[in-house]
Amino acid sequence: MHDVVIVGAGPGGSAAAYYLAKQGLDVLLLDKADFPRDKTCGDGLTPRALTVLEDMELLSELLPVGCRLNRVEVASAAGQTVTAPFPGKNGRPGYTLIVPRFTLDDILRRHAITHGAQFQSQVRVTGVTANGKGVEVTGKHPGGSFSATARVAIMATGASVPLLQQMGLLKKMPVVALAARAYFEEVKGLSDAMQLSFAGVPLPGYGWVFPLPHGAANIGAGIFPWGWAGRWLSRNTRQAFDSFIQTPQLREMLAGARQVGQVKGYPLRMDFLTAPTYAERTLLVGEAAGLVNPLTGEGIDYALESGKVAAEHVLRLFASADFSLPRLADYDRLLRQRFQRLFRVCSLTRDLFVNPLLINPMVRLAALRPDLKMVLIRIAFGEQNTLENITVRRVLRRVFAG
């Protein structure tokens, strides 16, 4: 019997495997894919993500293979732009790093293995069953059936929900955001800025240009098809992507550029505020727990952080030899203390301001008010969990007052 079985070798699963194996636990890390493998994503590592990667002693390995960005540039639907430095708050790095998941996830996986985790690929897990002594993980691999037992399981299965539904953790399908991205080479006009744009994309939603080394870029668009906007939003992310790259700015940047590979779409689970995070002998991390920023769609940072939090909690469970449901519920409280208020504020910011009525006035006002600009940037990148005195009434009053 293993100490811990982790299902999913993305950032959350591999981070948990690293922290647990480093402390001497017997850790089995499973994934349905062979590595390295592509993973459709925006590829952005925010200052929050970089803080965990630095703690894992991986930042020096990632810097040479990524593209360091020092600023964020936001364009309104009308095309007005505002630029700000990344907030290096609470001792975090004042920059972001763009690293394709093909590279990032394999580095994280190998790092966990180096520190003692066992890894098995091509395992499609179909069941996780808890009992009084632990969990049994069952599934299939190319050699036939698969089975492993452990004292605790960590689910790091991303946006995929069938296994969580089979386990009884999700009673209904969560509402998801939708995104699509493609890689391009020989892109014009790239700089040290992460570019976010509300032009050409159904609101609430945005397009992005994330530079990569050697003139390449991850370019995509995401939409949030729910609430009042769900009545008129297109749910076709390919249409949103095509509309975004046909904006004047993108046409200029992509003139002569070469698309590498296909446009790939993906869902984003942002339901942390209502999502389950634990069950008997089981913890959920990252997107499996709905931990994707509801304003930006960023999830790598929260996957890494929750992977670390889960590992620390599992170590406490082993130290106390208490794997009871109330002790597992303490993990949920830790996540709520860490992320609940931030996710509420991000959801509120999206719902109040990322709409056709207010997005242009908001960007225009942010260009005039550096304090407002930095509040919004800090909220978007998970560095602030309050809107302070920003309200719709105040924004409209300032805008129409000139």
Which residues does each PLM region occupy?
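Beta1/beta-strand and adjacent pyrophosphate-binding region of the FAD-binding site
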Residues: M1-G10
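N-terminal Rossmann-fold NAD(P) dinucleotide-binding loop
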Residues: G13-S14
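Glycine-rich FAD pyrophosphate-binding loop
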Residues: A21-C41
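Conserved N-terminal glycine-rich FAD pyrophosphate-binding loop of Rossmann-like flavoproteins
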Residues: D34-E54
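A conserved beta-strand/loop capping segment in the N-terminal third of enzymes
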Residues: L50, D55-D106
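Predominantly flavin-linked oxidoreductase catalytic cores and closely associated redox partners
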Residues: H111-L254
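FAD/FMN-dependent oxidoreductases across multiple families
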Residues: A229-H313
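C-terminal helical "tail/cap" subdomain of flavin- and related membrane-associated enzymes
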Residues: L315-G402
